C-alpha cells in the first residue's frame, strides 16, 4: 500500500494533485491523504503520517506533475534497495542549503516551466541515475519506508513553518543510519522555484544550530548542471532512463 500525503490549502492544486496521483497509482493499492489546514509542513506531515496505513509513504508538494508514467514500479524497486528516496539532494551537507557543497556532491533532476510554453529539464551532477550515499534530500517529493517516518517523526517545534522541514527529516534519517538516494529516473515538473527569504533564513539558522556538530566541513561551491529546453510532447522520450543517462553523461 502506498500512502500519499500532501499538505495544501489551495483547492485547485489539491484537486489536481489528487487526480494526478490517483491516475499514476490506479493499478496499485493506495490512499491519498490531504492535509488542508497544516500549521507547518512538519505538523501537517506528522498528521498525515498518523492517518496513513501504507508501508510506503510519499510526501509531496501540491505543484508537481510526473513525466515518468511508471512511478509506482520505480518507487517499489528503489525502496527495495534504499530507505528514503527523492529527486534532489547531496552526499555532503555543509549547512542548511542542500546545494551548498556544490559539485561533485549535489545531484538532481527537475523540470521547470519556461517561457513560450517550453519546459527546462535541469540536471545536476554527473554519475548514475540513482545516486546512493545521500545525506539530505529536497522535499519537493520524498518517498520512504514506513518504519523510517515512524521512527523519526517530524520536528514541528523547531520547524514550525514551511522551510527546512525536509532537510531536518532526511538528514536525521541519514544520521540514524538509514540509506538515502537521489533517483533521477523519477522525472517530474515542479511548477515553482523556491526563493530564499527572511523566513527561509530563520529556519536555516535553526537547522544549523540543531546540527552544527554533525554537518560536514567545507566551503560553498558551484554546482555543475545541464539545462535542456523542450516542448512538453518531447519530455517523456527525453526522460526515458537511457536518454537521461546519455544527457547526464555530458556532465562527466
Give the location of each predicted region.
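A recurrent flexible, glycine/aromatic-enriched loop bordering the glycosyltransferase active site
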Residues: 120-144
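Donor nucleotide-sugar recognition loop
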Residues: 136, 146, 150-171, 180-189
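Short, well-formed alpha-helical segments that are part of the catalytic scaffolds
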Residues: 10-26
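Glycine-rich, basic loop-to-helix element that forms the pyrophosphate-binding segment
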Residues: 38-52
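Conserved donor NDP-sugar-binding/catalytic core segment of glycosyltransferases
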Residues: 38, 65, 69-110
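Non-catalytic, C-terminal membrane-associated alpha-helical segments of glycosyltransferases
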Residues: 199-209, 223-252
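Active-site donor/metal-binding and catalytic loop motifs
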Residues: 181-201, 206
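Short aromatic/hydrophobic "clamp" motif used to bind/position activated sugar donors
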Residues: 57
Amino acid at each position: 500500500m502506498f500512502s500519499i500525503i500532501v499538505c495544501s490549502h489551495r483547492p485547485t492544486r489539491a484537486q489536481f494533485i489528487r487526480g494526478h496521483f490517483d491516475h499514476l497509482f490506479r493499478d496499485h493499492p493506495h490512499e491519498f491523504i490531504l492535509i488542508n489546514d497544516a500549521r507547518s509542513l512538519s505538523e501537517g506531515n506528522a498528521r498525515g503520517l498518523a492517518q496513513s496505513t501504507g508501508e510506503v509513504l510519499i510526501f509531496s508538494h501540491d505543484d508537481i506533475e510526473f513525466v515518468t508514467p511508471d512511478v509506482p514500479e520505480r518507487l517499489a524497486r528503489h525502496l527495495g534497495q534504499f530507505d528514503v528516496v527523492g529527486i534532489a539532494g547531496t552526499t555532503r551537507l555543509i549547512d542548511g542549503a542542500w546545494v551548498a557543497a556544490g559539485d561533485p556532491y549535489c545531484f538532481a533532476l527537475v523540470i521547470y516551466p519556461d517561457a513560450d510554453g517550453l519546459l527546462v529539464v535541469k540536471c545536476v551532477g554527473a554519475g548514475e541515475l540513482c545516486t546512493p550515499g545521500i545525506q539530505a534530500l529536497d522535499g519537493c517529493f520524498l518517498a520512504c519506508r514506513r518504519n523510517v517516518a515512524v521512527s523519526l517523526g517530524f520536528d514541528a517545534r523547531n520547524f514550525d513553518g514551511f522551510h527546512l522541514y525536509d532537510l531536518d527529516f532526511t538528514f536525521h534519517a541519514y544520521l540514524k543510519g538509514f540509506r538515502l538516494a537521489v533517483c533521477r529516473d523519477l522525472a517530474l515538473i515542479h511548477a515553482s522555484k523556491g526563493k530564499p527569504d527572511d523566513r527561509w533564513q530563520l529556519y536555516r539558522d535553526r537547522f544549523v544550530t540543531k546540527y552544527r556538530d554533525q554537518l560536514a566541513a567545507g566551503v560553498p561551491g558551484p554546482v555543475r548542471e545541464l539545462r535542456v529546453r523542450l516542448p512538453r510532447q518531447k519530455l517523456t522520450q527525453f526522460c526515458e532512463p537511457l536518454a537521461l543517462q546519455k544527457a547526464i553523461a555530458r556532465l562527466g
